[in-house]
Amino acid sequence: MSKINGKIAVFTVFLVLVVVYGYMQAPTNREVKIDSFLIQFENGTTEPEVKAILENYNMTLNYSIDCNSDNGGYKYYIKVDKDDMPDVVKDGLKKDKNWTDSGSPSFTKGDYVIYPVTEQAIHDKNFLEILKRHNIQVKTFVWCLVSYRDNSTRYDVLGKNCITEKDANRITNELEMNENVLIVMPEYICY
């Protein structure tokens, strides 16, 4: 009996060590991965132009492009010169909360402030009158999904259909330097 108890004790200790080792190794393999980018381009940017822009950057892996991607968010924007901002705001740009998209804050690109605007705003005569006085036009964002995903059942194979966070940060920074690119949003794979 004592031989059997000794074997069971050794086997139990071995199993505990295997489990502890497995838990210690698991977190080190969980690297943040990015499988696509949602990119917002300037009004009028065409899919061939998007392809030409992306070809100038090391995107790390092969990718597909969908420039009809519906982000489910804002669609319209206005571009206001920084120097004209005080006059446009004073004239009433921010008067009505329903004009600028509160869920999407304004951002700066070069010498301009980009304001996402609501669908309601582009039909509001008061809003349009302010834009007319300052020679500002409503524009439409061009959204493109740049995806590394392939048709395999595994979507998280680093170096095949997703990239590292470090590469994604580099690509984001490089693309946002392009005058036609407004925003680059990496799509993270969550665990």
Swiss-Prot record:
It comes from Methanosarcina mazei (strain ATCC BAA-159 / DSM 3647 / Goe1 / Go1 / JCM 11833 / OCM 88). Belongs to the UPF0228 family. This is UPF0228 protein MM_1428. It comes from the Archaea. Pfam families: UPF0228.
